[in-house]
Amino acid sequence: MLDADTTTLGQALTRLRRREQARRREVGMLLPATVFSREMAAEEAHISASYLTQLERDTAAGQVGVGILRQLIDTYHASENDWQYVCDLAGHQAPYPGLAGMSPTMDIPSLEQHLQALTPMMRAEMDEAAADLVSYYTSPQRRLLAANRAYFDVFPDQRPGLYMLEWAFGSPAARDVMITWETDARLGVAWHRGIMGRYGKTEWAQQAHRRLWQFPEFRDMWEAGDVAYAMAKDYVAQVRFDGRAYGMTMENWHLYSVSDAPILRSRGRLYPL
């Protein structure tokens, strides 16, 4: 099995600085041969060059402060997704107690815990949806928990417990069902990067990443460095079902329960394209 490449905070900050270098060259703020060095970046971010060097090399002592991360993000003209990502990598967005700095043997709530968090009312509401309304629940890590008949009509080879991105790369049916497979897969990989930023020290995330790393197209998309945490509100998924093309505009929201197993609720109505 190939060794899977993950991303550290230092690597993420280095990528952002180099991306900002390319942007400045493109808009004429830097000459083509001029480097946006650590020294230049540190001066603009009002930190020392030696500290930025330590951050990029992952040798800085202690946890980097949120204020310093914000200064670097602003200096690099990075997105809010990038901001969330570096905060996750720095351990500032721990979703469960003890996640920041947790040992590799610790893990997120189990699939069984998430399944137990689905109440009979939640399942009934999902099952009673109209035949053209695709409805399902996932964990925050995009593991499928439960879905209605309309969902399984469109995605017949999916099962509860599946990491949905693995299906996109590993199922022979995925490219036929997903009309815009490459666009959807790239979004999924960007979302996976966000998941790895937040949950990457857990055993589940490490195993899922290693399995995905076996797919060459996944590795190529991972190298692009894109990060996401949700679909755009106007994003339309295009699927092929029963020989016809359909669109779905998905609605997503988080549900929280006393079981400490948050759940993502999703639904979208099928309409002919």
Where are these regions (language model features)?
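Low-complexity, glycine/alanine/valine/leucine- and proline-rich hydrophobic stretches
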Residues: 227-273
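Residues in the recognition helix of alpha-helical DNA-binding motifs
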Residues: 16, 44, 55, 86-89
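A short, Lys/Arg-rich alpha-helix, primarily the initiator
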Residues: 1-37
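Extended, Lys/Arg-enriched charged tracts that mediate electrostatic binding to polyanionic substrates
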Residues: 108-126, 225-242
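Recognition helix of helix-turn-helix/homeodomain-like DNA-binding domains
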Residues: 29-32, 38-39, 45-63, 71-73
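Short amphipathic recognition helices of helix-turn-helix/homeodomain-type DNA-binding modules
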Residues: 2-11, 62-117
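PAS-family sensory domains
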Residues: 133, 139-231, 270-272
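Sensory modules in modular signal-transduction proteins
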Residues: 112-140, 151, 164
